[in-house]
């Protein structure tokens, strides 16, 4: 890591340069110049990848060319948000303790009211080629699919065309005209309506949607069905098991993954281990167990044989390879997953208390779990960033799910004082 003035950020012989990448937000170039200027104050060089993806920065950093990586992005958030994701020399996100130390050092510097240093940057065009070449080499091409791809007016606009062109796919592009302010705006993995409509209109084989920094991907089948991260985990997990490449026959998912995924994996002799929400926790469990596949319903999927983080482009090419090699359509493949009715309710609260101390809430949770048995799930947790209690229920019928989400949410409102 780099820190105080005079520090040199290298580990195990890594170079003395830091890689900087960004998505398409209008504030990106200014922030990149500020980061480079700050590094120059401690005699550390910077290489600028320009517009690239978060997993692209992670890959390039772990090749050993750089001491660390910095991705300037706010992922799926609106254009006016932005932030810094710092990647270690090994390609992983920083540990919480290291992030906290960096934040403390930044706070110390800001308290001194010193003038910031900007450093003009020139994009190194060779870096994207290294990343796209690597992705293309993880699969055996070509792909003869007709695809519709939504780049979310974000990072994928610079990377995806070269990759899918090399792999031979015919692509109709949407969400591929960034202007600095339209990243994630009614497009990308959080807004699948336009993608679904275009897939149906063009009779494409399937559609792919990335988010702003392309660390996640969601899909739309030829019939217009949304194919989420759960479905990808099932298809990839069962494919890896057939190839005898799934250690301990285990897939890592989160508490939000549908019970239908768990049942489908179990039918193939695969255990699903759940973690708290967040790709960070998924990765921690993967490393702990030596698992090679894990992810979230939201489309963050980690193939640890190839990447240290969720990678939307990698997920896309791996899914396409599975579909091609199966000789079936995506619709036919995902038909094996029977999702249980699921409902998520957010309850805005005035204050928090440990859920275990809320007697009436616990009583409702236990009653729901008794009624569902092994045919349902109850997940109640607080948001990590907002004053919300989240109630997620899965069960055999929509009627039962509605009943229990309503009862548990009402108990939370009574205990913690609902707002609004």
Task: Name what the model sees in each region.
Residues 1-37, 41-42, 122-147:
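An N-terminal, well-structured beta->alpha segment
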Residues 15-23, 47, 146-148, 249-255, ...:
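Short glycine-rich phosphate-binding loop at a beta-alpha junction
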Residues 17-81, 162-220:
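N-terminal small/polar loop signature for handling phosphorylated ligands or for N-terminal nucleophile
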Residues 20-24, 149-151, 221, 305, ...:
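Short glycine-centered, acidic/aromatic-flanked micro-motifs in structured strand/loop junctions
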Residues 24-29, 77-78, 153-157, 214-215, ...:
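Gly/Ser/Thr-rich loops at beta-strand to alpha-helix junctions
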Residues 40, 100-133, 137, 221-295, ...:
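Proline/glycine-rich low-complexity loops and linkers
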Residues 82-202:
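Gly/Ser/Thr-enriched, mixed-charge loops and adjacent short helices
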Residues 206, 243-420:
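Phosphate-binding and adjacent anionic-ligand microenvironments
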